[in-house]
Amino acid sequence: MQNPKILVTGATGGTGLPVVRELMAKGFPVRAMVHRRDARSAELERRGVEVVLADLYDPDQLLDALRGIQRAYYLPLIEPYMMQSAAAFAVAAREARLEHVVQMSQWTSHRAHPATMTQQTWLVDKLFATIPGVAHTIFNPGMFAHNFLRMIDFSALLGIYPVLSGEGRAAPVSNEDMGRVAAVLLAEGPNHHAGRRYRPTGPELLSGREMAAIIASILGHRVVPLTLPIWMLGKVAQQQGLDPYLISCLRHYMEDMKRGTFSFEGGVTTVVEDLTGVPAESFETTARRYAAMPFARRTLRNRLRAFVNFNLTPFYPGYNFDKWDRKMRLPRTAQPSLSIDDDQWRAAHAAQMAEKAAPLVTGRRLRVA
């Protein structure tokens, strides 16, 4: 029997690219959807992947991308109007008679969350569950390891590790592990995974200070964990030219971490190993890859750049996130609340964590949600 053809949105991104690679290794035909052609998409084409250019806000382009497709990986846009793109995808999926969608969601997904992206993610969870004839699977990771390693150059070059989450702890999961999990869900399909949700995590809970110690052991020199107030994030983001919308959301996730959202009910699952047969990689393993990247190498040029940028950061005015949110007219609920403060969220997510004790047997190997 021929394997079903699978569409991967965000196919050149942090999780999309690992999904494409894993599916190809499993022998599945893949259509990689990108929003622009570049060296990464060209490399996919050289490897025999069908690449299509489409706008996630355009229902017609999405319908064209979905024609002849049985299953799809949906990666949401990190943009203020993400909900519109999700609605366009839902319309196209129904018209194209898609069999199964695997959706990247969030552990924090909550109707009243102060981060607009998380409010909208909750709506997408509900919307995709109601697409007629389309099976729906959610995987809802917590904190990505990438979020804790994007500033590893500060550690490598200056011997400091910025900590924005206080003493809060999370089990950071790598992009590669998320890609492997999504690929299994897509490959095994709706007969095994329709209507289910899975939370991939790293293998252990870590605080910012513990991450700093791991990074120090990798680099071979002292790294000082530097606790920073959340307003400093606005200065760093502006100095580095980062998207204010993304960082506006990230500040709330740092507060989530402080409050124990990511360590709730133990905070660690075995989903990665249960689904893929391989244990989740450690934070140390992921950090070693980042430490070897060009931006973190201890060259004279990188050292000078890091020194200048670090010393200039306090002089930047920084993003005023609340003002920026108002200017963008981002939707807000009447009474915003962090996920951990909501009884409905706690009940639903406690149940999800408890499900690991109630395995689903597929007939081929054990599955634990």
What is the predicted role of each segment?
Residues 1-43, 57-60, 67, 79-80, ...:
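Oxidoreductase cofactor-interface core, primarily capturing Rossmann-like NAD(P)-dependent enzymes
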Residues 9, 75, 104, 277:
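Residues lining the SAM
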Residues 48-50, 136:
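Short, conserved active-site loop motifs that form the nucleotide-linked donor/cofactor pocket
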Residues 54:
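Cofactor-binding loops of NAD(P)H-dependent oxidoreductases
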Residues 66, 70-73, 102:
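N-terminal Rossmann-like NAD(P) cofactor-binding module of classical short-chain dehydrogenase/reductase
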Residues 105-106, 261:
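Short secondary-structure boundary segments
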Residues 234-369:
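A hydrophobic C-terminal alpha-helical subdomain
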